Design a protein with these regions (language model features):
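Mixed-charge, low-complexity intrinsically disordered segments
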Residues: 76, 81-117
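Acidic/polar residues at beta-strand termini and the immediately following turn/coil
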Residues: 92-96, 126, 218
Length: 251
C-alpha cells in the first residue's frame, strides 16, 4: 500500500512538472507571406438618453512581406453596417446596399464611409506585435485609429509567459492615452487566454475611462483570434458604455 502511494505521488509530481513546462510559451507573430485573414469587428455604444450606435465592420488583411525584423500587411475594409441614434434621429447605413436602397441619411453616410472602404492600409509590425509604421493610400485623417483598433494588435513581452504572467502597454492617439494590462489566465489546446484591464485618460481632463475583457491568442500564429472588451467613459457630463467583439479568421 505504501509502495503504491509513493508511485502515485511520483506520477503526480511528474505530471505536474510536465504541465508546468508546457504552460510556458513565447508569444510571437508567425505570419507567412501570402496569408490572408478576415477581421470582423462588432461594436456597440450607449450614451443613455443621448443615443447610441451599433456597428459591424469587416476587413480583409493580406501578409505582403515577411522579413527578418518585421512584417508588412495590406488591409482594406470590405463592409460596414451601422445603426445610430442621436438627438432623436435614427441613421442607418449598409455598404452592401445600392444607392437606391439607401435613404437620404444613408447616402450622406456613404459619402463619408466610401472613401474609407477604397483606402488601402499598409502596416509594418515587428514580431512582438509593435506597430512600426502605418500608411493609408489615399490618406484619410483619423482612419489610422479605427483600423489599428480593428486589427486587435497586442504588444507581446520579450520573455516567455505562463499562467499568472502579466505585462502592460501604453498607447496615445489623438489626445487619448490608454494603459492596458494583460494577464495570462489559461494556456490550453494551443491557445493563450488573457484577462484585459486598463485605463483611458483624455487630454485636458476631458474625460476618463476603464476597459476590461478577455482575448484569446493562437500560439502557433500569434494571432489574437477572439476578443471581447467592455469600456466605460465619463466625459463632459456623459457616461458612455460599450462593448467591442473582434474575431480574426484565416481565409
Amino acid at each position: 500500500m505504501k509502495k503504491m502511494k509513493k508511485v502515485l505521488i511520483a506520477l503526480f509530481v511528474i505530471t505536474t512538472l510536465s504541465v508546468t513546462a508546457q504552460e510556458s510559451v513565447l508569444l510571437r507573430l508567425n505570419y507567412t507571406k501570402g496569408d490572408s485573414f478576415l477581421v470582423t469587428t462588432e461594436s456597440n455604444q450607449s450614451m443613455g438618453s443621448q443615443g447610441g450606435m451599433n456597428m459591424k465592420m469587416t476587413m480583409g488583411m493580406i501578409v505582403a512581406d515577411v522579413a527578418e525584423e518585421n512584417i508588412k500587411t495590406e488591409s482594406q475594409i470590405t463592409s460596414i453596417v451601422m445603426d445610430m441614434m442621436q438627438g432623436g434621429m435614427t441613421m442607418n447605413y449598409d455598404s452592401n446596399k445600392s444607392d437606391e436602397e439607401l435613404d437620404q441619411m444613408g447616402q450622406m453616410l456613404k459619402s463619408q464611409f466610401a472613401p474609407m472602404m477604397e483606402a488601402i492600409i499598409y502596416n509594418t509590425l515587428d514580431y512582438q506585435g509593435n506597430m512600426i509604421d502605418t500608411k493609408l493610400d489615399p490618406a484619410i485623417p483619423g482612419m489610422e485609429q479605427i483600423t489599428n483598433r480593428s486589427m486587435n494588435a497586442i504588444n507581446y513581452p520579450k520573455e516567455k509567459v505562463s499562467v499568472g504572467s502579466s505585462w502592460s502597454s501604453e498607447d496615445e492617439n489623438q489626445g487619448m492615452k490608454m494603459t492596458t494590462k494583460y494577464t495570462v489566465s489559461s494556456i490550453a489546446d494551443g491557445l493563450v487566454t488573457l484577462d484585459v484591464s486598463g485605463d483611458m485618460n483624455m487630454s485636458g481632463a476631458a474625460g476618463t475611462g476603464t476597459i476590461k475583457g478577455k482575448t484569446t491568442i493562437d500560439i502557433s500564429t500569434g494571432i489574437s483570434n477572439n476578443s471581447e472588451i467592455e469600456m466605460t467613459i465619463a466625459t463632459q457630463g456623459m457616461n458612455i458604455t460599450g462593448t467591442t467583439k473582434i474575431t480574426v479568421s484565416k481565409m
